[in-house]
Structures are given as C-alpha cells and as structure tokens.
Amino acid sequence: YSASGDRVGSISRTEAGQPLAYFYGRNVLGIFQNDAEVAAHASQDGAAPGRFKYEDVNGDGVINDNDRTKIGDPNPDFLFGFNMNFSYKNWDMSMFWNGSIGNDIFDNTALYYESPAFFNSNRSTRVLDAWTPSNPDATYPALSETILNNEFTQSNSFFIRDGSFVRLRSLQVGYTLPDSLASKIGASSARLYYNGTNLLTITDFEGFDPEVPNSGSLLFGWYDGQYPLKSVSSLGINIKF
C-alpha cells in the first residue's frame, strides 16, 4: 500500500517486514559537480552539473522508479515523558517534559518554498544557497526556470527531516502565602500560581512544530505547514476560607 502527498505522488509505503508507512522515494547522493561526474554515473534523465544525483539502487545502470527505496521512517525509536517536582520553603514547582526520538518528517512545504524553480511565487531565503560553479558545496540544486531531474516532483530523501524533539509540556510555579498574610484577607491559606503549557520545544526541525499530526491511516509525519500547538500561560490563586 502506498500513501501520497499532494504534489509528489507516492511518498510512503507499507509492506511486510518494514516499518509501518515508511517514507519511500529516490535516495539523493548529492549534487553533480561537473560533466565527468554525470558521465561516470548511471543513466539519469536531466542529469547535469548542479542537479541531484540519485542512487542506482538496483544497479542496472539506469535511474528510474525501480530505484525508489526506503528514505525515512516516521515511527520514533522511542517516546518518553517525565515529571519533575520541587519545593523550597513556600515555593513549589512542577513540570512535565515529553518527547520523541528517531522519527523522520517529510517536509512537504519545501516543495513550494525551497524549490529551485520559480513559478511567480515567493521562495525561502534558503535557496540563496543554491549550487553554482563557485558554490559547489551548496545545499540546494542550481536555480532553474523549470523543475528538472524530478527533483521537486518526485519523493526523494532531500525532503526528509529529523523530527526528534523534547518539549516542556507543562509548567506550574506556585507560592503559598504565609498564614499571617492569608489571614489578613480572611483566608486560612492562599497560594498564587503561574501555569503554562507548550512553553519550550527543543528540536532541529525548522518547521512550525515537529509534533506533526497523522495525515491519514497510513501517512505519518507528513508536514504541510500545519498550525503548531499553541502556548498558553495563565495566572491564578487558590484560596481556602
């Protein structure tokens, strides 16, 4: 079974013996630097200096759909969460962290904002690091007026991102007033507190949020600029009379 993105066709596959809904496509080995590299490589449509170089997975000397392979896994190696509680005199603090390690994300937004081909729309400043003869170590293929080499029309490993993250899911800090102060407002006890959710996310993923919701029963980790989890802060007071 294969699941599809909206522009690049099939991006995931489910089969016996493999992770559920793993990412499937062409494996990018790098960028062709010169004509000699093109000539030495397997036959590949659109091959030229500045274009992606794909892996000849089956070794038949021709790059085509038969060379699609596993390029990522949206399933994490492990999930974790832990609570921490502290108190000192009248102060108390509790927090909950959770995270995901080892999962990949297919960044579908890159198909639009990072494409080396311009179609009368805005692009990310990241494409300024596009390949030129004087910039051979570029991250992106050479800029072009057309999409070449199936670079941004077929699923490939260029769009796979590390989706690992650690998130401060909740934090509460409280201060219990001394009884002498609480009694002045006619209370037996009073506690002021701050409560926050989704305050901090530690991740290498550059999108809005690495915690990507499932896009289908067999399409996980497909990032299309979904709105991130919101951060919420509140103040409160608990009073007992």
Model segments located where?
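C-terminal beta-signal and terminal closure region of outer-membrane beta-barrel proteins
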Residues: 6-36, 128-130, 134-138, 203-241
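Outer-membrane beta-barrel pore domains and translocons
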Residues: 87, 98-100, 195-199, 240
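Membrane-embedded beta-strand positions of outer-membrane beta-barrel proteins
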Residues: 95, 192-194, 237
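Membrane-embedded beta-strand positions in outer-membrane beta-barrel channels/transporters
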Residues: 81-83, 170-174, 234-236
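Repeated loop/turn-to-beta-strand initiation elements of outer-membrane beta-barrel proteins
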Residues: 90-95, 180-181
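Conserved small-residue
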Residues: 1-74, 204
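Extracytoplasmic gating/loop element in the C-terminal half of outer-membrane beta-barrel translocons
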Residues: 18-22, 35, 46-47, 100-191, ...
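Outer-envelope beta-barrel architecture signal
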Residues: 78, 89-91, 164, 186-190, ...
